[in-house]
């Protein structure tokens, strides 16, 4: 830091005075040496200390220098202490030590500020500690972050149809969502698609070639009817049928000639569903081979379940395009038609039917791939609000009968996003329309955009008909076995509060 400036006064301490004399005497001689060499001059120093001890320095020979001094008679510069003090005072040094670099190093206010700032910066850097590691986010394409430990992600690179409202890549910070639990039931739907949700029958046609990405958290229910209960999956990625181009069927268009595999993409991409991460049943559409020859049914309404607090976009207006409706493969045993209100939509629990309804003059309910009609999660999870005996066939042909006695089950579209694929596939023409009450209302607080109950013209939406019983026979061989699922008591909506 340099030498400290001292007041040029007599040092009272004897010891300090001796030390200072020794140091400065040598410094003076050093300066004389430098001056003699640099400027080619002769210098002689004669010093007597307080004890009258002589110390002398001469650049060459003291006698020669002294001889010149005695013989020199011309005017010359001669200074004393008073002269030096006066000169220093004029320079503003106030009699302090000479500002030679070797003699002192001054701490100017500017230097003090610099040093203090450097110290503060260094202290801040050291005290701040090492930067925290960034959180590890696992990016999974077209999956929705969920909190359910049963996180299964089904992906098939066959096609790239994705529901427009689904996040393309949602980061899953929870490691439990990255791998499916070993205990979950996972039956391969198609030989070519090992990552399919459990289903049997002819579901292989659609699932094997579709890009079915079930949102994480879609844990397979042990029921294993071919449907996946997407527990806490906010969104459902639309399943595209084999060779489907992911085309959304226009509003109120007749069933696609090819019976394109039904997707669950939203009919109206502008509709945004806010889905809380609570358990939501999901049923991936089954194979296209089972283009169900259901009658062109005018789905007047769907079961009106208790409105949930979940925010939902009302898609139940009579003019809504029926094509976006995803219907459960199982007809409701309930005999009455129910109106689906926007509040009810929040309760829809993504129980997407493998088939979709394209309502033309009478909404033709194409239930593609119902071969795997499995209420896996809904029955096991008790998510069916009004348990009804559903006669579902897991074989390629399904004979679904609705029993008037038992109330309809709550079926919900996982996210209500239905994208109907218009692919030229063999589909039986819609039979004469039969009014069939379809229950798509799920108890989970899912915001299902697919208003399964919205009729083609919106008529008869609000009039439940208790005396109506419409058994729906899906085109299947008569020898197909029906899977009878136990009716489940409808759960109260307070149980869905997360």
Curated annotation (Swiss-Prot):
Composition bias, Pro residues: 426-436
N6-acetyllysine sites (modified residues): 247, 401
One Gene Ontology molecular-function label: DNA-binding transcription activator activity, RNA polymerase II-specific
Amino acid composition bias (Low complexity), ranges on this chain: 444-457
Underlying gene: Mef2a
Tissues expressing the protein: Widely expressed though mainly restricted to skeletal and cardiac muscle, brain, neurons and lymphocytes. Differentially expressed depending on if isoforms contain the beta domain or not, with the total expression of the beta domain-lacking isoforms vastly exceeding that of the beta domain-containing isoforms. Isoforms containing the beta domain are expressed primarily in skeletal and cardiac muscle and in brain. Also present in lung and testis. Splicing to include the beta domain is induced in differentiating myocytes.
A Pfam family reported for this protein in Swiss-Prot or TrEMBL: SRF-TF
Domain notes: The beta domain, missing in a number of isoforms, is required for enhancement of transcriptional activity.
InterPro entries registered for this protein in UniProt: HJURP_C (IPR022102), MEF2-like_N (IPR033896), TF_MADSbox (IPR002100), TF_MADSbox_sf (IPR036879)
An annotated GO BP: MAPK cascade
Region (Disordered): 172-220, 240-268, 388-498
Organism: Mus musculus (Mouse)
Stretches with biased composition (Basic and acidic residues): 458-468, 479-498
Spans annotated as Beta domain: 287-294
Compositionally biased spans, kind Polar residues: 198-220, 388-400
Function: Transcriptional activator which binds specifically to the MEF2 element, 5'-YTA[AT](4)TAR-3', found in numerous muscle-specific genes. Also involved in the activation of numerous growth factor- and stress-induced genes. Mediates cellular functions not only in skeletal and cardiac muscle development, but also in neuronal differentiation and survival. Plays diverse roles in the control of cell growth, survival and apoptosis via p38 MAPK signaling in muscle-specific and/or growth factor-related transcription.
Disulfide bonds: none
Major site of localization recorded for this protein: nucleus
Modified residues (Phosphoserine): 59, 98, 108, 233, 253, 353, 406, 444
Numbered residues of crosslink Glycyl lysine isopeptide (Lys-Gly) (interchain with G-Cter in SUMO): 401
Protein name: Myocyte-specific enhancer factor 2A
Subunit description: Binds DNA as a homo- or heterodimer. Dimerizes with MEF2D. Interacts with HDAC7. Interacts with PIAS1; the interaction enhances sumoylation. Interacts with HDAC4, HDAC9 and SLC2A4RG. Interacts (via the N-terminal) with MAPK7; the interaction results in the phosphorylation and transcriptional activity of MEF2A.
Record-stated family: Belongs to the MEF2 family.
GO cellular component, one term: nucleus
Residue span of region Required for interaction with MAPKs: 264-281
